[in-house]
Amino acid sequence: MRGTPGDADGGGRAVYQSMCKPITGTINDLNQQVWTLQGQNLVAVPRSDSVTPVTVAVITCKYPEALEQGRGDPIYLGIQNPEMCLYCEKVGEQPTLQLKEQKIMDLYGQPEPVKPFLFYRAKTGRTSTLESVAFPDWFIASSKRDQPIILTSELGKSYNTAFELNIND
């Protein structure tokens, strides 16, 4: 997102620009656990020289005005190699976090927001929370080592919901 909050032409709102490619990097939680891929699951493992974190791809939704305001920047979140995107769906009564073979730029190019694949990224200092757009008040979370990345509605309890996104320059 590129914004000029005080710009008169933008009406005091952020001005969004089209992007030609996502930004990439890695994600870790405050316990220095990084995201890795084990089979079809994202798992949090302690950072070490022998661990290769997944490369995440992030791109801002082109149509933030179509979504709830004040919750954070709406982003699509994917991984590279294999190219997959995170999305949320209800399994039984519980919203769950899934990976789906999906090109992030195909989502970005859709004529309207694809809510199951969108997350509100709310930044606080160097960390961010990632809240499901499809399931408000459900956040991406990690827990103990070698456990899958999940969705939780229990902020600040037994799960880590604050993540650092380390962007490649």
Swiss-Prot record:
Recorded GO CC terms: cytosol; extracellular region; extracellular space; nucleoplasm; plasma membrane
Function: Cytokine that binds to and signals through the IL1RL2/IL-36R receptor which in turn activates NF-kappa-B and MAPK signaling pathways in target cells. Part of the IL-36 signaling system that is thought to be present in epithelial barriers and to take part in local inflammatory response; similar to the IL-1 system with which it shares the coreceptor IL1RAP. Seems to be involved in skin inflammatory response by acting on keratinocytes, dendritic cells and indirectly on T-cells to drive tissue infiltration, cell maturation and cell proliferation.
Induction: By TNF and by IFNG/IFN-gamma in keratinocytes. By Aspergillus fumigatus conidia in peripheral blood mnonocytes; involves CLEC7A and SYK.
Keywords: Cytokine, Cytoplasm, Immunity, Inflammatory response, Innate immunity, Secreted
Name of the protein: Interleukin-36 gamma
Main localization, broad class: cytoplasm
Sequence similarity: Belongs to the IL-1 family.
GO BP terms: cell-cell signaling; cellular response to lipopolysaccharide; cytokine-mediated signaling pathway; immune response; inflammatory response; innate immune response
Annotated compartments: Cytoplasm; Secreted
Proregion residues excised on maturation: 1-17
Pfam families, sorted: IL1 (PF00340)
Disulphide-bonded residues: none
GO MF annotation list: cytokine activity; interleukin-1 receptor binding
CDD domains for the chain: beta-trefoil_IL36
Post-translational modification summary for this protein: N-terminal truncation leads to a dramatic enhancement of its activity (>1000-fold). Proteolytically cleaved by cathepsin CTSG.
Tissue distribution of the protein: Highly expressed in tissues containing epithelial cells: skin, lung, stomach and esophagus. Expressed in bronchial epithelial. In skin is expressed only in keratinocytes but not in fibroblasts, endothelial cells or melanocytes. Up-regulated in lesional psoriasis skin. Expressed in monocyte-derived dendritic cells and M1 macrophages.
Subunit structure: Interacts with cargo receptor TMED10; the interaction mediates the translocation from the cytoplasm into the ERGIC (endoplasmic reticulum-Golgi intermediate compartment) and thereby secretion.
Family annotation (SUPFAM superfamilies): Cytokine (SSF50353)
InterPro entries: IL-1_fam, IL-1RA/IL-36, IL1/FGF
Domain of life according to the entry: Eukaryota
